Amino acid sequence: MNQIDTGLVKRLIGEQFPEWAHLEVKPVKFSGHDNRTFHLGDKMSVRLPSDAAYAPQVEKENKWLPILRKELSLPISTPIAKGNPSEAYPWPWSINKWIEGETVTKQNVRDLSEFAAHLGSFLVELQSIDASKGPIAGAHNFYRGGLISVYDEEARDAIENNKDVFDETVLKHLWDLALQSTWNRKQVWVHGDVAPGNLLVKDGKLCAVIDFGILGVGDPACDAAMSWTFFDKSSRKIFKEVLQIDEETWNRARGWALWKALITYDANRDRKSTRLNSSHNVASRMPSSA
């Protein structure tokens, strides 16, 4: 496969959507891991899966996002057109409406507690939408909304590999707590990757939620993992209150955050990087975080 760059995007647009071939194509400032994203003019974006594992996300987003967006008060990713596999690129791809906003950071949020409340309210809205026909959590969304126990071996290996860095006993206890319960209520919609890179702010306030590639239905615990990766103690409390999360679900949410921090640290331990530092901070703070 050719490298995913502006040249490839221009070729695909020219071949499949010639009416937009005159528009400028340029990479977005922050592109994710699962997809490579490019501006298409001022009002659209092009998203191309970076690997075959992420290709099914295109069909899923095109099917469900137009339905979900009607029930949500905040803008979300909006598919405009779907590109087909071709000689130049082997998987389906999408053209979406461009949403104005900045990727959220601690520096551009007006008030962290306000942001936590607004994000919590959005997730409550998402969870209230009928999910009876939605895609059940599984391999297609890396089990977000499914049983966290699918990552048990991976998490325990990471704890063992890094017991010289973290408190092994405490982390094993937190992980065990996450495995002690399951979601036994009605399955709900989960975004699957509620993280700063997928949240936009304008004038310091949450203005949009994007990248629903690992959307699914199941246990909402995974969508609360940001409690430990972004919020401080007071904003974390507000987030929990707005979501009305019981303690067992809270333990599973913490488990999702712990698993991701541990495997990220384990994979990057031998090289200095922002990912190494941030994952270390999350795993180190977790024992003292309610």
Model regions and ranges:
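Single conserved hydrophobic/aromatic residue that forms the stacking wall/gate
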Residues: 276-290
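Short, surface-exposed alpha-helical segments at coil->helix boundaries
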Residues: 6-10, 62, 233-237
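ATP/Mg2+ or Mg2+-diphosphate-binding catalytic cores
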Residues: 55, 156-161, 237-245, 263-275
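Juxta-kinase regulatory segment immediately upstream of eukaryotic protein kinase catalytic domains
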Residues: 1-19
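Active-site Asp-x-Gly
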Residues: 55, 187-190, 195-255
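Hydrophobic alpha-helical segments that form the core
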Residues: 254-263
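ATP-binding pocket architecture of kinase catalytic cores
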Residues: 2, 20-153, 157-169, 182-184
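Generic recognition of well-ordered alpha-helical segments
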Residues: 11, 15, 63, 67, ...
